[in-house]
Amino acid sequence: MTKEVLIHQIIDVLSRAGFALSDRCNIRPRSFDVAARKDETLLLCKVLFNIDGLNEETAREMKYLAEYLGGSAIVVGAKTRDQMLEDSVVYMRYDILALNVQTLYDYFVENIKPLVSAAPGGLYISIEGDLLKKARTDQSMSLGTLASMVGVSRRTISKYEEEGMDASIDVVLQLEDIFGVELARPIDILKSCGSRKPRKKAEPEKEDPQVKHNALLPEDLILNTISMLGYDVLPTAQAPFKAISRDKSSVILTGVSEFNTTVVKRAHLMSSISCITETQSVFIINGRSKLKSVENTALIEKKELDKISDSQELLEFIEERKDTNSGA
């Protein structure tokens, strides 16, 4: 199987599950390959044939993007190291959940949650501790008796009950057989950030007093201007846009560049993504722009941005530009 085949399979599964999908991200490097939405569920999906190809920087950006957009970041792949990913098993890479296409299908199409997670040392299942404790006490069974039956320590049984500690598949099967109840806790693939409140900004690095304001790159100066309008700005390194700008009432995918053919292509992609993420989309042009908008992405020249006084005025400007859609 090639990555291209894998991507088509993932798109097919999400479509069958009722998701609307953005255009595929065709930039390199990229923190996600496709955005998908179904009702209130938003996914940022990264496709990797080998999930070990995910690096820490990309994972960090995926998490930040998902948090800012109120969605969930997942990796879908086919293998890890020298073996294929197992069905109904979830894997973790830098705190990003990873799974194969079959598990994706089971969860979103068949509504079957996985039970098994991969971790160093093997495969594990989380136990419903309250259910285990109730089943044991209902049978007036001591911790020691149950521990000897399963082949673990009393302390381990106690941790299963009080902390829901993960157990091996064999142990869980034994416990379920002893009590005749299901004890495995299903895994919720959707790690949604919930509210759309901005994350707390990281403490800024101490600036070298030798570095002056005019030494900043033009793109950084533009993002600083947007920040001064009242936006919380999250710069990106591997997304089709330069940053996500947000205040208490709006979220804007924000591109910054001089006008060229690449800008038009990215503006198309940003428009598609913004429809899925339910955000605004704007490209700030450093210089002159030949277009007012590309689909739902407004193009605003820097000199126009400099005249805008607050976030509400910027939103109105974006809406006005979208109304003059060029259809490019």
From Swiss-Prot:
This is Putative HTH-type transcriptional regulatory protein MA_3524. Gene3D superfamilies: lambda repressor-like DNA-binding domains. Keywords: DNA-binding, Transcription, Transcription regulation. Residues 143-162 bind DNA. GO terms for molecular function: DNA binding; DNA-binding transcription factor activity. Residues 132-190 form the HTH cro/C1-type domain. NCBIfam families: PRK04140.1 (NF003162). It holds the Pfam family HTH_3. The keyword DNA damage does not apply.
